[in-house]
A protein has these predicted regions:
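N-terminal and secondary-structure boundary signal
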Residues: 2-212
Length: 212
């Protein structure tokens, strides 16, 4: 299905949760104590800072509650962006943790192939990796660049003119971003912004970003 998508409409339809959460002004009474607004750092103004919800309870129930506390319902065709994780490793969100939320929103787990040779470089291998890690047991899984990519324009063109994203991104109306914090040997870290930028880039798109 062809559907026109701009950078603005894509970002507006995306919901960031777990790793970085935009809070509603007040929490339901049932959630107080288990989920709390993050504290401001010294010198920060509440009027200029984003509100973030945090919880020490890392469980499927808490994940659903924090989603509900946002006050914005996922609607239409919902994509749930995760990292499927490298085969043989454990650095990915466990299906048991995200299952309740994914099924609550009737979401499809989405990913794109990697830019480097490995067990997630081809769609066939990537699907097998997702199966091995248990994601097919909880929801449908879509490798979004399995049928190519399209150019998504970017606003700041200092380094990039566009992002090459998986063509199946056009099939969704709403995206929930489930990212886990991960350190990288080259002095950086992966989180929500990476998961929703280079994470939805096709294999070619990832190479394009890395060489910009």
């Amino acid at each position: 299905m062809e559907k026109k998508m701009t950078r603005r409409s894509w970002m507006k339809s995306s919901l960031t949760t777990l790793a970085s959460l935009t809070a509603v002004s007040s929490l339901p009474t049932s959630l107080k104590g288990s989920i709390m607004p993050a504290k401001l750092l010294a010198g920060e103004s509440s009027s200029s800072s984003s509100k973030v919800l945090m919880t020490k309870n890392i469980s499927s129930d808490a994940l659903v509650k924090i989603y509900e506390a946002l006050g914005r319902k996922a609607s239409g065709r919902v994509a749930v962006k995760i990292s499927t994780g490298e085969p043989g490793g454990h650095n990915f969100l466990q299906p048991s943790l995200i299952k309740d939320l994914v099924q609550k929103v009737d979401g499809t787990i989405v990913e794109c192939n990697t830019a480097y040779a490995g067990k997630r470089f081809t769609t066939e291998d990537h699907i097998q990796a997702a199966k091995d890690h248990g994601f097919f047991d909880i929801a449908k899984v879509d490798i979004m660049d399995s049928e190519g990519e399209f150019k998504l324009p970017v606003k700041d063109k200092k380094h990039l003119q566009y992002n090459l994203v998986g063509t199946h991104l056009k099939n969704y109306d709403f995206m929930i971003n489930l990212a886990h914090f991960k350190g990288h040997a080259m002095g950086g870290f992966g989180g929500v912004l990476k998961n929703q930028s280079i994470g939805v880039a096709s294999s070619k798109g990832k190479a394009y970003i890395h060489t910009a």
